[in-house]
């Protein structure tokens, strides 16, 4: 029997945060209204930045939830669309174990009607990104993803839906930060000599704004009654001039904008467009914390658009739920073996405030992951390694005290990047640290902030950043002024001490190929460096191997992850302090 939910009973089962704003939308033209009769009310359910979070204890929302909610609304006679604003196939082991295939299957079964690609849709490579487009039963849109060989868009810029005579257009937009927050090499030819794909942005945002405005104008030409942005841009100031607010302020024609990328909980905020017209901007946060619900109500003379965020829902589609549970079980079986015990918590966030810290300052988990790379080469591969680096954006989850499994490490390092070892100059190391520290002290996060093993350094935040970068934030040249990063020291095991970096000397530098070889986060200073060994081991396996090297096993027979039990504790004078949430003091921010 079909289950109908009244508004009263729905509000009992769904936690709803009322929108902070509603906007009036311009009435459809006389020609659009005449002969069609009254335009219908339209409901748009939306998600963003789910990042493969399908195994929740809390919050409780899942793809099964949103599938059931959509069906419930449809059974009530509502006209419903379900859309996603990007970053859905990557984030946990439930995405990376099959390159997002099961996530796309879940979205297909849940009844998604449309999506736009986020930067993490490219994390498994360009070939996989394009295969995802074929596996999805729903279309993708992006007005600014360009094939430079043909000059054409890879995807349609808009999708127009005819909802009982009302035409709703969605304009897809992908963040230009994709180049550096995914892997720039994926956008290049096989020899990595030139870019063959582009995500239009521009230093001043002009290329992005132009692409968006052209898409809006196309939607108008096709007779759209309502034009909705479906963008993966975000509102973080560090993303300027490519934020959703920047785009709205430099274009005209949007009625509302569904956003993603910055993981911001924004039920609804009005932003003035270039003509001063208010546009409703909304974002659900991340990880299925909320489902967005936008209602287009043409009842009044001008009509209104309102938004709510739904934080809980009791319904679950049985088919979608079964697919998710089977996959969770499979992954847990593959990765569930316990390998160690954490006697304390390892953090990517500030232990006191809960605010994410890993992209701007040292933490004990940042130290641990970097140490894992360092120890892997020195102890397992038995290859001399002077220094290891790990980008903060590649460290994704706090780890509570208790049992560690392969799955734990996969949750922390879900990208599938591979460790490598290179011979570089001290000058290249200095350039990398300077580039990584360019936002330090500003309050802006940087996925390329470098955690280190076998090294210490200072960041002098009062000194302005003068590193040269291109419009895609890829490194172009050394700092032209006084460097912010100073007193870089490299650990010397024979001396049992840290000694000053020699710019002219060659060092063995370890890290992930994402950073050292594939221009990830824009690290181009290592181009042409001598490769000692590549494709050594996947990121989470490097971390797992390090955990299993610890001592301290007691009655449980498992290594205990304390500073004293680390194999690096045998290195005289090596800085270790996993008991301190803020790390061992390798990075000093002044």
Language model: regions and residue ranges:
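Catalytic centers of hydrolytic enzymes
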Residues: 3, 38-43, 47, 52-59, ...
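Generic hydrophobic alpha-helical segments
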Residues: 17-21, 73, 264, 380, ...
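A short, compositionally biased domain-edge/stem linker segment
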Residues: 22-35, 68, 493-496
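N-terminal export signals
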Residues: 1-3, 9-31
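Acidic, metal/ion-coordinating pockets
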Residues: 7, 11, 15, 33-314, ...
């Amino acid at each position: 029997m079909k289950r109908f939910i009244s508004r009263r009973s729905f509000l009992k089962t769904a936690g709803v945060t009322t929108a902070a704003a509603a906007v009036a939308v311009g009435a459809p033209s006389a020609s659009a209204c005449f002969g069609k009769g009254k335009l219908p009310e339209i409901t748009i359910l939306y998600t963003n930045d789910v990042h493969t979070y399908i195994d929740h204890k809390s919050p409780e929302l899942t793809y099964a939830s949103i599938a059931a909610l959509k069906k419930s609304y449809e059974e009530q006679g509502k006209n419903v669309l379900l859309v996603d604003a990007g970053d859905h196939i990557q984030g946990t082991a439930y995405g990376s174990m099959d390159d997002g295939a099961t996530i796309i299957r879940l979205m297909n079964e849940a009844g998604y009607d449309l999506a736009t690609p986020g930067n993490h849709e490219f994390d498994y490579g360009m070939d996989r990104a394009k295969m995802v487009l074929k596996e999805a039963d729903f279309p993708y849109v992006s007005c600014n993803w360009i094939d430079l060989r043909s000059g054409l868009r890879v995807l349609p810029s808009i999708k127009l839906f005819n909802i009982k005579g009302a035409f709703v257009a969605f304009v897809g937009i992908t963040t230009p930060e994709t180049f550096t927050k995914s892997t720039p090499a994926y956008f290049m030819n096989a020899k990595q000599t030139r870019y063959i794909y582009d995500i239009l942005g521009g230093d001043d945002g002009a290329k992005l704004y132009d692409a968006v405005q052209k898409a809006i104008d196309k939607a108008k030409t096709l007779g759209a009654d309502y034009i909705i942005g479906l963008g993966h841009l975000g509102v973080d100031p560090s993303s300027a001039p490519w934020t959703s607010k920047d785009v709205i302020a430099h274009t005209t024609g949007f009625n509302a904008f569904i956003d993603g990328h910055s993981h911001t909980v924004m039920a609804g905020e009005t932003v003035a467009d270039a003509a001063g017209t208010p546009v409703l901007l909304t974002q659900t946060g991340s990880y299925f914390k909320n489902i967005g619900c936008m209602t287009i109500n043409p009842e009044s003379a001008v009509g209104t658009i309102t938004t709510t965020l739904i934080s809980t829902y009791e319904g679950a589609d049985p088919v979608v739920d079964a697919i998710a549970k089977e996959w969770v079980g499979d992954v847990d079986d593959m990765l569930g073996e316990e390998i160690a015990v954490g006697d304390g918590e390892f953090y990517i966030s500030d232990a006191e405030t809960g605010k994410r810290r890993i992209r701007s300052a040292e933490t004990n988990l940042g130290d641990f992951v970097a140490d894992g790379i360092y120890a892997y080469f020195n102890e397992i591969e038995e290859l001399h390694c002077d220094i290891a680096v790990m980008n903060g954006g590649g460290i994704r989850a706090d780890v509570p005290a208790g049992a560690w499994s392969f799955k734990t490490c996969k949750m922390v390092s879900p990208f599938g990047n591979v460790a490598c070892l290179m011979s570089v100059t001290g000058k290249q190391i200095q350039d990398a640290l300077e580039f990584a520290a360019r936002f330090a002290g500003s309050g802006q996060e940087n996925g390329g902030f470098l955690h280190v093993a076998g090294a210490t350094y200072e960041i002098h935040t009062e000194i302005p950043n003068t590193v040269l970068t291109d419009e895609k934030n890829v490194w172009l040249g050394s700092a032209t002024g006084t460097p912010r990063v100073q007193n870089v020291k490299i650990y010397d095991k024979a001396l049992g001490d840290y000694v000053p970096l020699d710019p002219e000397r060659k060092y063995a530098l370890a890290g992930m190929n994402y950073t050292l070889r594939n221009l990830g986060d824009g690290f181009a200073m290592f181009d042409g460096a001598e490769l000692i060994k590549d494709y050594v081991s996947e990121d989470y396996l490097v971390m797992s191997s390090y955990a299993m090297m610890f001592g301290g096993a007691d009655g449980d027979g498992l290594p205990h992850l304390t500073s004293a039990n680390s194999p690096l504790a045998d290195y005289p004078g090596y800085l270790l302090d996993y008991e301190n949430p803020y790390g061992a003091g390798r990075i000093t921010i002044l």
